[in-house]
């Protein structure tokens, strides 16, 4: 059980028991959805979104919340009943609805004001009617961008991504020598690079930021070498290697 290995890292017995109860409740929901899949012989639309949410993204956000709490961090999870990411009805390739999402931000802002860290599952949205939806590939990048858009109306906001690599001057799978680290990119440069194959950041995430008229830095940090950082801004202050 992969989740059990994580739960065992929580030293506080009360938090550990609470976390186990949450995991079991979500997995029970996932089992109900799986039964529907077997009955309908179809893994699509809201059934697909519900299973991905209950067995993965939303469940993991609750587990992360308990891990943070066990480390003494004042944290909370954003529950699905006050989910701030509202999308259209394209259930498997949803589109972010900024105006409708802004109307749902009050509870999330209240949680933020009372805590230091909030956890939320990526990739998942819901319609105005409350039906679960999913973004396409790269959806977690879009979730971060969408939250940045929503929070920027009230807070000074930036987005930090920890990735397998910061941005390089060429595809390291193709070019093996003389690769340079790119420290600065514009929104447009990053979006175009994504459209032509750069996998580090979903270009739709940047497109949504631009379309909503938001200016906030996007920081890409190499997890293995955290000194390697790329900053993406509307008007970058520095140019190198591109």
Predicted regions and their residues:
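C-terminal catalytic "cap/lid" subdomain
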Residues: 1, 8-11, 16, 35-40, ...
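A short, GP-enriched loop/loop-strand-helix hinge that lies immediately N-terminal to
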Residues: 45-50
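Core structural elements
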Residues: 21-39
């Amino acid at each position: 059980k992969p989740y059990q290995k994580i739960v065992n890292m929580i030293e506080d017995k009360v938090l550990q028991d609470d976390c186990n109860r949450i995991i079991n409740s979500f997995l029970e929901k996932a089992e109900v959805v799986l039964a529907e899949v077997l009955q309908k012989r179809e893994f699509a639309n809201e059934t697909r979104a519900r299973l991905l949410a209950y067995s993965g993204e939303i469940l993991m956000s609750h587990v992360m919340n308990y891990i943070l709490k066990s480390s003494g961090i004042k944290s909370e999870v954003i529950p699905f009943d006050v989910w701030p990411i509202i999308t259209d009805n394209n259930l498997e390739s949803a589109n972010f609805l900024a105006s409708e999402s802004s109307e749902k931000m009050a509870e999330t802002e209240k949680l933020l004001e009372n805590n230091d860290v909030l956890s939320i599952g990526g990739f998942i949205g819901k319609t105005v009617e409350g039906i679960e939806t999913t973004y396409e590939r790269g959806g977690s990048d879009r979730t971060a961008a969408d939250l940045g858009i929503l929070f920027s109306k009230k807070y000074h906001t930036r987005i930090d991504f920890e990735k397998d690599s910061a941005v390089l001057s060429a595809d390291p799978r193709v070019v093996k020598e003389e690769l340079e680290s790119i420290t600065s990119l514009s929104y447009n440069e990053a979006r175009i690079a994504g459209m032509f194959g750069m996998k580090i950041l979903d270009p739709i995430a940047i497109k949504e930021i631009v379309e909503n008229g938001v200016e906030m830095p996007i920081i890409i940090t190499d997890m293995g070498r955290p000194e390697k950082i790329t900053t993406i801004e509307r008007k970058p202050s520095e140019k190198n290697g591109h």
